[in-house]
Amino acid sequence: MRRSAITLESEISDTERNALFAVMKNLSLKGTHLEIGTAAGGTLCEIYNFYKSSDREIPNFWVVDPMQYFPDQLDIVKKNLISNGVNLASVRFLESLSSIAIKKAFIENPVFDFILIDGSHKRKYVTQDLIWTRFLKKGGILCAHDYSSRFPGVQKSIDLFLKKYKNYKLISVTESLIVIRKMDTTKSSEITNMMMITAAVDGFIHQIRSSINKRVSTKNSHT
């Protein structure tokens, strides 16, 4: 059982959340908030409580998660939200992989003020998650957790995204939370097919290298 399933706490540290809220308090983010990867719903609860404690309008939320992180995840998430005063009617759950859930977005064309990516650490999936930025409004906030050298799939995906899309501005990096603002609309859609192919190939190569290194390490330990 994952620790967050027991504690129901956010997997984002207090320091990271405080840095995020320091940015958010100076912005008017009244539109829908998207969370990709929710664990036990702890971070959503923290964001909700931030708005409530600062007497701000509480936005609606979308949660994208296959709900397979730990047993009974969806039920645990809902109970956690309710215990924190969150009205479940304001939360839309898309219980599927990000790559599947986004098909609904292409049909409905939503607009998000805030996107938090905290799902798979593999480069292929982080790149897929970044497709959701097509629906992030000008002036909106994009965050990604586990942005560090410990998770090269996350770090490389975000770095390449910022390098390609100059209309996104790096605001802060605190521990492993990166905060980015969309300063202008994107002339062409975020994340091209070539970027997806490159991410998949790069991830495959990384997996092979990791497997080889692990085997070599195991072999050396027995010699």
Question: Each predicted region: which residue ranges?
Answer:
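S-adenosylmethionine/decaboxylated-SAM
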Residues: 2-7, 11, 17-223
